[in-house]
C-alpha cells in the first residue's frame, strides 16, 4: 500500500513530520526504527517521527515518547525512550541533498507523473530562510573519511567486497581476452601493490600458475632503496615472474633525441619516464600474449595525477574506482586477513609473515611517483600530497561533490567544520580551489580511460556514471570559492 507519507512525497513534500501514538511492546522500537529509515529511504525524504510520551493513559498500553529523525535512510537523531522529563530531539536534515537525490531517481519521477493528486492538498510556500551563517556550527557531523566506514567490522566487510569485485572483473576480462599473462608494473607504492594482489587473487580464482603474472619493476631516476626492495619482495613472494627493466639509459637516449636537458627537472623530465614504463609494459604484454593491468586509483583520476598515455593507460584498470584513502585499507585487509589471523590462507604466498611486513611498510611509505631524484640520504623528495594536497581532503571533496552534488560554498562550510583542529580554514579553502581547478582541467584524461570495475557509488567512468565535456569551464566554481569569506 501507498502510505500517507509516500503520497505527500509524490506530491512534492521533502520532509515528512509524523506525530504518532504508537504504544510500546517488546521489539516494537526496532521495527519502528527500521520503518522510519525505510520510509525516508524509499521516498527520498527527511522523516521526523515523534510518539506519545509516558504520561498518556496506561490502562492497557504504555507509550515511550520515541523520537526519530531520519534522512534518506540514515539516522540523524534519536532520543532515549521513556523519559519522564520534557526533552527536545533535534538534528540537521540536508534539504539540498534530498533535492539532489530525487533528481537522480527516474522511478520517483515516473511515479510522480502518474500518481500525483495535487488538488487534494493545500500548498503553503515558505520563503527559504538562512538558518545558519558562516560563523555558526552544524549540529550534524560529517565523516572526514567518507569512503571508509567508522567501525572496524564494516571496514573489513567493505574491503573484502571491493577485493572480490576487482578480482571478478579481472577474471572475466582475462578469460574474454584469452590472455595468457597479466603484466603489471610494480613501483613499491600502494596502488601497484593492490593491483598485484588483485592479480594474485584472480589467478588463484582461475586456477592459473602465478608465474603467468609478469611483475615488472622499472627503476628510474627517483627510485629509492625502500620502494625497490619492497617491490622485489612482494613480487617474489607472490610467485610472479619477476622482471627488472631499468629505464635510465632509454630515457637519457630519448632526452638526447628530443633535445631535452636532463638537468631540467620539468614535466618533460617526469613524463618521459612514465611513458617509457608504459611502453615497456605494453611491449612485454604483446610478447607474452597478455595485457597490461592498470594501477591508477579514483583519486588520481579525479585530480588528473597521471601522465597522459603513460600510467594513465592500460588494458584493464582494477583500481580505477577505489579512492586513495581506501586503497591502504584494502591492502591492510589482505595483510591482516589473508596473511595472518584466524582466516589466514597458509599457502597464500611463499612466506606470509615476510609479505605481511612488506605490505605494512608499503602502507607507511610516503605517496610519491618517484620521478625526481631522491635526496643525499636516499629518501623520497617528491611527495605527492605536498604537490596536490592531502588525499584525505581531496577524497572528502570528491565524495560530497559527486555523491551529494554539493556546491562550492556549502562544501567549504562543511569541510572547514569537519577538519577543524586538523587543518586551518584557509588551508581547506586553498585545496578545495585546487580540487575544482584540476577536476575540470583534467577531464580530458578521464574521457579516454581504460575499462575497470566500479566498486562503489562514486566513480568517474565516462561510459556510465560520469559524462562530462572535456572542455567544461570551472569559472563559476572557482568564482564562488574565491567569494567565500573565512
Predicted regions and their residues:
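ATP/NTP-dependent adenylation/nucleotidyl-transfer catalytic domains that generate, transfer
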Residues: 43-45, 54-57, 71, 78-79, ...
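CN hydrolase (nitrilase-like) catalytic-core segments centered on the catalytic cysteine
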Residues: 2-89
